[in-house]
From Swiss-Prot:
One of the record's GO molecular function terms: tRNA dimethylallyltransferase activity
Family: Belongs to the IPP transferase family.
Functional note: Catalyzes the transfer of a dimethylallyl group onto the adenine at position 37 in tRNAs that read codons beginning with uridine, leading to the formation of N6-(dimethylallyl)adenosine (i(6)A).
Binding of ATP, residues: G9, P10, T11, A12, V13, G14, K15, T16
InterPro entries per the UniProt record, alphabetical: Dimethylallyltransferase, IPT, P-loop_NTPase
Species: Clostridium botulinum (strain Okra / Type B1)
Gene Ontology BP annotations: tRNA modification
Assembly and binders: Monomer.
Organism placement in taxonomy: Bacteria, Bacillati, Bacillota, Clostridia, Eubacteriales
Enzyme class: transferase
Protein name: tRNA dimethylallyltransferase
Record's signal peptide: none
Length: 311
């Protein structure tokens, strides 16, 4: 069985530094579980790790696809599983680091996101419905059939909303029901999972998020978005709907002021962190690490290593 170490948590909590220190001490390589860092050219807005910050530790699933290309949880699962096997077969420890809970779940739960047959006509109908009546309307259709997905997914995540509705139409079951009916096989995975969630005081986390946004602006987020536009990437693409990118696009189009854009990026990032924490709390296998209780990152790293070895 393959040992798999997972370091997750909300945006700006400090997953990158902890995961690198762990990789250094445990002879590991890092697989990014971040739905924005998979895109090329989108470096500043995704807070993508730099080559210097990697400190020589190999990183996987960063800069995987072009911003216009389709990439979903199934794509991630396929690439991540290949990377895990490759890292393990070379005698190293695969470490998953990131904040996209759905990506992480695709590895630690044994369910197939593509089990139900597809209904292209229904997908096209829902997409057209979103164009005519808005994403919020299509999202509202989930409420009566799958309240959990309704709460979990947000309206602009149209692809996943459509998928949830499609599964219900084909199977007569919500995705939530489908998963519950298959709970016995859910944990039948080829990994020995050690799953840690980093967290900290909410006020401190929000301060870090606000500061990170200011740093992004200082590094040239506006110029990055301008460059992406000049390369032909448009607001309707999934990648360009990411927090930071959509707000700057609004600013560049003259819809809002720069101050408003910065405010919205900070607010959107804080709300995203809140949603991430809600997601991670649902997994009973995860061990929470309160960073406020430790005097240094080294102490946190040593604590995680001890818990892994004592398991």
């Amino acid at each position: 069985m393959i040992d798999l170490l997972i370091i997750a948590g909300p945006t700006a909590v400090g997953k990158t530094d902890i995961s690198i220190k762990l990789a250094e001490k445990l002879n590991g390589e890092i697989i990014s579980a971040d739905s924005m860092q998979i895109y090329k050219y989108m470096d500043i807005g995704s807070a993508k790790i730099t080559k210097d910050e990697m400190k020589g530790i190999p990183h996987h699933l960063i800069d995987v696809v072009e911003p216009h290309e389709e990439f979903n949880v199934s794509s991630f699962k396929d690439l991540a599983e290949k990377s895990i096997k490759d890292i393990w077969n070379r005698g190293k420890l695969p470490i998953i680091a990131g904040g996209t809970g759905l990506y992480i779940n695709s590895l630690i739960y044994n369910y197939d996101f593509t089990d139900a047959d597809r209904d292209e006509k229904y997908r096209e109908y829902l997409t057209k419905l979103a164009e005519d009546k808005g994403n919020e309307y299509v999202h509202s259709l989930l409420k009566d059939i799958d309240e959990e997905s309704y709460e979990k997914l947000y309206p602009n995540d149209l692809k996943r909303v459509v998928r949830a509705l499609e599964v219900y139409k084909i199977t007569g079951k919500s995705i939530s029901e489908y998963i519950k009916e298959n709970e016995k096989k859910l944990y039948d995975i080829p990994y020995n999972v050690n799953y840690f969630i980093l967290n900290m005081n909410r006020e401190v986390l929000y301060e870090r998020i606000n500061k990170r946004v200011d740093i992004m602006m200082g590094k040239g987020l506006i110029e990055e978005v301008k460059k992406l536009e000049s390369m032909g990437y448009t607001p309707d693409m999934q990648s360009m709907k990411g927090i930071g990118y959509k707000e700057v696009l609004f600013y560049l189009n003259g819809d809002i002021s720069l101050d408003e854009a910065i405010y919205l990026i900070k607010k959107g990032s804080r709300n995203y962190a809140k949603r991430q924490l809600t997601w991670f709390r649902k997994d009973k296998r995860s061990i929470w690490i309160d960073k406020d209780k430790y005097s240094s990152e080294e102490e946190i790293v040593d604590k995680i290593i001890k818990m892994v070895k004592d398991k």
